[in-house]
Each structure stands twice: as C-alpha cells, then as structure tokens.
Amino acid sequence: MGNYLVLQSDFGLSDGAVSAMYGVAYTVSDDIRVENLTHDILPYDIWVASYRLYQTVKYWPKGTVFVSVVDPGVGSDRRSIACLTYSGHYIITPDNGSLSHIKHYEGIKKVIEIDEVKSRLPHSEESHTFHGRDVYAYNGARLAANKIAFERLGQAINVDSIEALEIREATKNEDSVTGSIDILDIRFGSLWTNIPLAFLKSLEIVHGNNLVVTIYHQDKKVYQNIIKFARSFADVNVGEPLVYVNSLVNIGVAVNQDSFSDLYHIGTGNDWTIHLSKAPSI
C-alpha cells in the first residue's frame, strides 16, 4: 500500500473543515502525503462525487487511499464504508451512491462497513455531523499509513448491497449513437458524455467529419446543430462549437474558448440525452 491519502468533499475552502481533515490525517502519521482531488463539488451532489472518483482514481498508484465526503445523510443510519477496487485502490465514503461509477466501470472487490463506534477519532464520540474528519479522514490516514489493515476497519458486507445511482449505457445503431450528458468540464462549460470514442469509430466517423448533434431534455429537443468532429479546440475558430474526445476517451461537446453549457442552457444527468449522427455530404 502506498502512503497517499486523497481527499474529496463538497466543503469548499472558505472555512476550516478541510484543514481539520488534514490535521487529523497528519496527527495519525506524518509519513503520509495528503492531496486534494476537489473540494468544489456543489453541496450534496452525490452524482458528481461519484463521477469525479471514476475520473481520477485509476490514475493514482495502487494502494492510494481516497476519502470522499459528500454526505447529506451525515449522522443518520446510513452506513460508512471502505472499499477495495479491482484496480487496487481504497475508497472511504458514506454508503449513499458515491461509489456508483467506480462500481459500474472499474469494479469493487471488497467492501467493509466501518464500525463508527470503534473506528473513529478518539474523543469525538459526541460529534455527529463531521464524519469527514472523525471517521473518514481518520481511518483513511490509518489505512494509508499502514496502521490498520483494511479488513479490521469493520465487518465485510456484500458488494451488491451498497447504494448505487442509475448509470445508463450509451447505445448505437447502424448510423447514429445516443448517450447521456454525464457531467461538465466544470470550469470551461464543456459537455462530457458517456459515449465512448469506439462507438464513433464503429460508424467510420473520423476527425474532420461533420456531425448532426441533437440534445434533448426530458425527451424535448432543446438544441440541434451541425458540428465538426475535431481533434482539438484549435481545429475550429474561437467561438465555434466542436465535438471532441475528452480525457476519458469519451465524446465531449464544447465551444472554443467559451461555455457550451452557459450559451445553450444545457445541463447534466440522465434526463439530458445527446444524439450524434454523421451529417450528409453537401
């Protein structure tokens, strides 16, 4: 196991919450390295927490421990869990769907229900609203520092018993592909879909082709345009839209140096559908 501990939350950095998690981790061991995935997730957005783990975990060394705290049910009877993925990474999080994308795309080998009474920061028994510090950062640091074995965090539970959000698969037919807009490339407003590049290749769509892009919200068409399938943003003029391959080798839709989401009022989630087909030659 490595000595990396990577933190994710919806806490932001405007108060001391994240710093307190760092402090607890380094009190457990000053031999670990604590890093941030993000703390800018919108409050209570479990879907985004799940996706950001999927986006990031596999690029860290095996044995890295992740702590994800987007926890609207903190203090309730929801479970606290730790998982070992098939890629060899550990994730500690509330059992509220935060592992949905990891379970679906990467696979989870083992899950432990953390004993919140025994496995928590000493003298924190009266605190019921900051498990991110008292349970997750504390146990994540112990795991990263090799001060506790994964199996000793609590009781093993069935992988299929954990909470999971609905994840839809992209589909294709002989001349088109359809998928969901999973998430935004948040700072730039680009759309990230669940459509793999392989689907476009199977239709013999290559860079330089024009595509008919149609977007639906709750089955109502809200956008349609003919857009170039570009290798990079530089392949189109500033202000022009493009279809491109994102860093997960899925299909994205963007505007060069502008926000596609803001310009066209496009959101994300399973009720946002995108349809791509090759535009007819003129």
Segment roles from a protein language model:
Residues L263, T268-I282:
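Pepsin/retropepsin-fold aspartyl endopeptidases
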Residues L191-H265:
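A conserved acidic, glycine/proline-rich C-terminal tail/linker
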Residues D10, N139, N256:
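A residue-level signal for conserved active-site and pocket-lining positions in enzyme catalytic cores
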Residues H123-H207:
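Anionic-ligand-binding alpha/beta catalytic cores of soluble enzymes and soluble regulatory domains
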Residues G2-V70, R142:
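Alpha/propeptide regions of enzymes that mature by internal proteolysis
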Residues F66, L211-V213, L242, N270-H275:
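Generic structural signal for buried aliphatic residues
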Residues V28-V34, V48, W60-V69, G75-V135:
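Active-site histidine-anchored catalytic micro-motif
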Residues F11-D15, G73-S76, D258-F260:
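Short acidic, Gly/Ser-rich segments with clustered Asp/Glu that frequently serve as metal-coordination loops
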